[in-house]
């Protein structure tokens, strides 16, 4: 071992290159259907807010909007929130989505809406 610490080569730990994979959750139609009520225009946001929650809310809102009759096309979506919060970036994504929908979104707190959940609760665009 030499006295100069900077002259030594670092040990190689692996011969394979580092791969970055983004895990994509499988789309489970039964799970999506359990989180919405098309007749009442209800979408449920229950649990922690993360990147999967963002995708989940977008899919659920699209399902509600796409399965409405033409008479109910402009009725508001009711987003029911029960969350301790979570990722602020995902919450901001949900807020951007809500603000850019063609229909109003009523936000309803059932239980708790803390942290990122409170941001989403305050962002409702309905009555």
Please provide the spans of the model-predicted regions.
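Terminal-region recognition feature
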Residues: 1-127
């Amino acid at each position: 071992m030499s006295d100069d610490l900077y002259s030594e080569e670092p040990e190689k730990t692996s011969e394979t290159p580092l791969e970055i994979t983004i895990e994509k959750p499988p789309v489970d139609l039964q799970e999506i259907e359990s989180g919405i009520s098309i007749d009442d225009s209800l979408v449920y946001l229950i649990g922690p807010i993360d990147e999967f929650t963002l995708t989940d809310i977008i899919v659920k809102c699209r399902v509600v909007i796409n399965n409405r009759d033409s008479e109910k096309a402009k009725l508001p979506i009711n987003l029911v929130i029960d969350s301790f919060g979570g990722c602020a970036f995902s919450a901001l994504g949900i807020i951007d989505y809500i603000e850019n929908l063609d229909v109003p979104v009523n936000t309803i707190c059932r239980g708790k809406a803390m942290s990122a959940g409170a941001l989403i609760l305050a962002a409702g665009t309905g009555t």
